[in-house]
Structure formats: structure tokens, C-alpha cells
From Swiss-Prot:
One of the primary rRNA binding proteins. Required for association of the 30S and 50S subunits to form the 70S ribosome, for tRNA binding and peptide bond formation. It has been suggested to have peptidyltransferase activity; this is somewhat controversial. Makes several contacts with the 16S rRNA in the 70S ribosome. This is Large ribosomal subunit protein uL2. Belongs to the universal ribosomal protein uL2 family. The lineage of its organism: Bacteria, Pseudomonadati, Pseudomonadota, Gammaproteobacteria, Pseudomonadales. The keyword Ribonucleoprotein applies. Pfam families: Ribosomal_L2 (PF00181), Ribosomal_L2_C (PF03947). Keywords: Ribonucleoprotein, Ribosomal protein, RNA-binding, rRNA-binding. Signal peptide: none annotated.
Length: 273
């Protein structure tokens, strides 16, 4: 994997920084694991905008990724590593010994030809999936379940990882990349290693149009709007908004805590930094 800075042959190329991975599959994805992905433009079934800054972009297919890793004891060979437009991480196409193929989040260091396996007796090796109670303390993991059998919900983006720091009774304690310490049921599964494509954060799209290709529309500042559109709008000349930063609906933003899920507060040993 290499970081490539483009030569400034035009204004749109001047600030482009690419991450080039020669191991990525250059052909079409595996068709039986594709699904149609419709565009919403950020609207709900009433036609109202529920998520701003969404619209346009290149057509995409959704890749059906296996987050459960529940084919226990059946070895699989990594056929290839692929690009996935729906996530920052790369995905790996596995071919199991019984002939079935599945996509998984590609772990760092795993390449075509490697053998992976799931289950309580799986070797301690990057890419293998085990219950947290069977993983040694100090191990780096990703793709962590919050409920046994539901599938991975934590630590799925490019370069992400968590560390298993303690085991007590039916729970284990994980240190997440944010600094949060969280308890998770020891029966939940996780995948060893960290997520691939850790250089993703170093890339630069270089121009506004590249953002539009991804289906992301411009973000207008509140102070550039009229008072009818935003609490920071209006004023004579250029103003700073005159109040602490808020959303278009008046809720504090930029650092205000928004967590309200008291039901799982007892699972958090230490809040994130």
C-alpha cells in the first residue's frame, strides 16, 4: 500500500493524495453477494429531508458482508481483497471448504491465499473469529458483537481496533480507540487483529467534485444563512453568530454531550476522552 501525491497538472489535481493498494481485486465483485442500493437523497417516505448533505453520486451495489462469522470449524481460503464503496475498510472474499463464499471485513495483514477459521478452537491469528472468552488478554480485536449472535457492531471502520484488557465473570472489558473502557458479554464474538486500510485517513479528495461523486452535497455555514433558516443567521455584515454554536434547530453542537442511553450506562467503565 502506497501514498501517492498527484502532480499539480490542474487545479483539481493539485491537492489530491491517493492511497494505492496493488493487492485490491481489479475485476467485478462477486455477483451473488450483491444487492441493489437505492438512493434516497436524504429524504424519508414523506419526501422530507431527514439527513442533510446527501444527494447525487455514483451508482453503487451493496455488498452483503458476513458480520456474524458463524460457520464454525469450517476453514476458508481468502480468494481476494476488494474495494467496497459502502465503507472505509476493504472487504475479503472467503471461499469455505464446503464451497460457500462470503464477504468479511478485511483484517490488516490478511492477503489472498491465507486460511481463516471461526469457532472456539480457532487459532489465535489475525482474521480468525472467536468468542471473547477464548481470546487472550492484551489481544487486539475488531468486529465486536454487543449481543451474542447479532453480528459485529463495534470497531468496523478502516484502521480501527480495540484491546481486550480484563475478564471478570461473564463480561470482558475492552479499551476502544476513543479511550472508552466498555464491558461486553464474554460470549460475544470478535475478530483478531485490526481493520485493514489504516491509511484511509491520509487521503485527500482534492476537489469538491470528488465529494459529489460520493453522494455528499455541500455544507452551508449557519452564519451565511438568513435568520429564518438558522439561529446563527442574519446580522449586518459578517458576524460570528453571537451565541454558542448550535444546530439549525437550536441544540448545542461542537462538543456538547448527546448520549441519553441510560439503559447501558453500567456497561461503560470509563467515558471516552
Amino acid at each position: 500500500m502506497a501514498i501517492v501525491k498527484c502532480k499539480p497538472t490542474s487545479a483539481g489535481r493539485r491537492f489530491v493524495v491517493k492511497v494505492v493498494n496493488q493487492e485490491l481485486h481489479k475485476g467485478a465483485p462477486y455477483a451473488p453477494l450483491l444487492e441493489k442500493k437505492s438512493k434516497t437523497g436524504g429524504r424519508n417516505n414523506n419526501g422530507r429531508i431527514t439527513t442533510r448533505h446527501i444527494g447525487g453520486g455514483h451508482k453503487q451495489h451493496y455488498r452483503l458482508v458476513d458480520f456474524r462469522r458463524n460457520k464454525d470449524g469450517i476453514p476458508a481460503i481468502v480468494e481476494r481483497i476488494e474495494y467496497d464503496p459502502n465503507r472505509t475498510a476493504h472487504i475479503a472474499l472467503l471461499k469455505y471448504a464446503d464451497g460457500e463464499r462470503r464477504y468479511i471485513i478485511a483484517p490488516k495483514g490478511v492477503s489472498a491465499g491465507d486460511q481463516l477459521v471461526s469457532g472456539i478452537n480457532a487459532p489465535i491469528k489475525a482474521g480468525n473469529s472467536l468468542p471473547l472468552r477464548n481470546i487472550p488478554l492484551g489481544s487486539t480485536v475488531h468486529g465486536i458483537e454487543l449481543k451474542p449472535g447479532k453480528g459485529a457492531q463495534l470497531v468496523r471502520s478502516a484502521g480501527a481496533s480495540a484491546q481486550l484488557v480484563a475478564r471478570e465473570g461473564s463480561y470482558v472489558t475492552l479499551r476502544l480507540r476513543s479511550g472508552e473502557m466498555r464491558k461486553v458479554l464474554a460470549e460475544c464474538r470478535a475478530t483478531l487483529g485490526e481493520v485493514s486500510n489504516s491509511e484511509h485517513s491520509l487521503r485527500s479528495l482534492g476537489k469538491a467534485g470528488a465529494k459529489r461523486w460520493k453522494g455528499i452535497r455541500p455544507t452551508v455555514r449557519g452564519v451565511a444563512m438568513n435568520p429564518v433558516d438558522h439561529p446563527h443567521g442574519g446580522g449586518e455584515g459578517r458576524t460570528s453568530g453571537g451565541r454558542h454554536p448550535v444546530s439549525p434547530w437550536g441544540f448545542p453542537t461542537k462538543g456538547a454531550k448527546t448520549r441519553t442511553n441510560k439503559r447501558t450506562d453500567n456497561m461503560i467503565v470509563r467515558r471516552r476522552k
